[in-house]
């Protein structure tokens, strides 16, 4: 399991992101920020989901190219399942489910808030205990 290659997909709000992991090591990641919301002073949910629909394919292809991998190297997909904007989540979940089904690999639903917390463990064997996590999101 340590060398398993996992593709991570994140579309919970207004950033489209993908990352490749080999075991606990992040190989490469890309985050596309949606500038379409700037003039509105906040995120417009409908625009966010449309932008995810436009950006997700290129972001996933880009992360694979940067890592010099193809979809055939991916052994599982982790995707944000919530909480977040319903339309944005639907785009990411649908894309990930389609890939997982087409590649016949496992799909893992990830809680967005728990993902923030567990990101502290990326690249770490352990964290010194006890530790406290304050999470402010949104």
PLM regions and their residue ranges:
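Short acidic/glycine-rich loops and adjacent helix/strand connectors
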Residues: 1-137
